[in-house]
Amino acid sequence: MTAVFVLHSADGTTDPSAFRKQAFGECDPFARHREIAWEGPDAMAAGRIRFVGEFDVARYPHIETLIVVEGELTLEAAGAAPLVLGPGEGAVIGVGTALRVAAESRVLVMFCAAACTKPTKRGLFALRADADFKPSASLPAEVLLGAAPQCRSDNVFIDDGAGYCAGAWDSTPYHRIVRPHRVNEFMLLLAGSVRFAAPDGSVLSLGAGDALFVPRGAPIGWESSERVAKFYVVQNVTVSTERE
């Protein structure tokens, strides 16, 4: 299946050839540590970061969601208490945020970043598996193969300047047809498992601890038989996000 980019497999089978070492923009604070699996025309990228050490950033240059899968990462925004992230925890950093980043030993982090020349939100925002879930819209009947699911979400961060939204989401089981994905979407599964189907009939099965990226327009289906929870980032690419 080529529609989905697997960024991390909890069972340790992640393909290292799927990544290339590359900075995200000219002022990337993780330039020496970043490995990109997907970068699109809408100034968004997804992949992983392997990091140990510390640094300070006076003004974070882009929007970035970071989710730890191995080790411990400390993020400290100016004037705020340190945010210590372990496996299965994450945070979103807004453009312009003054930040200290530290890891005493090597940490493996999934990322989804987006450039934004006209940001609307600054700061550091925690992502938690025990999110403040609220009922959210279900799927239209015409794309479902069975009963409509009950969905909940907690939108932790929204920046209208990049069409970027990050948070947590969960749902009861459902089965959806293969259709073009309507947004760029990063996911890290927190609970449950999903069978992602391609038009050729192939299926990719992913579960808790796995991370993936689905580009806008990629044809993909969804089938789950249990509650699924995930951290997510979505980008509405109708918003212009070109770098200056």
Which residues are covered by each model-predicted region?
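Short hydrophobic/aromatic-rich beta-strand segments that constitute the beta-sheet cores
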Residues: 75, 110-111, 178-179, 196, ...
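A short, N-terminal "cap"/entry segment at the start of jelly-roll beta-barrel domains
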Residues: 1-43, 113-163
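Short, conserved beta-strand element in jelly-roll/cupin
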Residues: 60-75, 180-196
